[in-house]
Amino acid sequence: MYLTIEETAEYTNLSEDYIKSLVLEGKIRAVHDGEQFLIYKEQFKTHLEQLENYKALVQEILNEPIPEDIDVKDED
């Protein structure tokens, strides 16, 4: 499935200008049909999955309780 720059911006929660600049820099693969750029949606699948995994990992770390009895010997 192909998306326009506007649809890609909505899908990725990024601005249209930023998406367009990434396309023009060649950082996002796109096809130009004469009128608009068309971007293959599946190229973002792995990235978005990794982003969700990272968010879950960060949340897990933040929710981990701090031990009540920290056995630290201060030798100062």
UniProtKB/Swiss-Prot annotation:
Q: Domain of life, per the record?
A: Bacteria
Q: Which InterPro entries match?
A: HTH_17, SinI_DNA-bd, Tn1545/Tn916_Xis
GO molecular function (one): DNA binding
Q: Which residues form the signal peptide?
A: none
The molecule here is called Uncharacterized protein YoeD
Q: Which organism is it from?
A: Bacillus subtilis (strain 168)
Q: Which gene encodes it?
A: yoeD
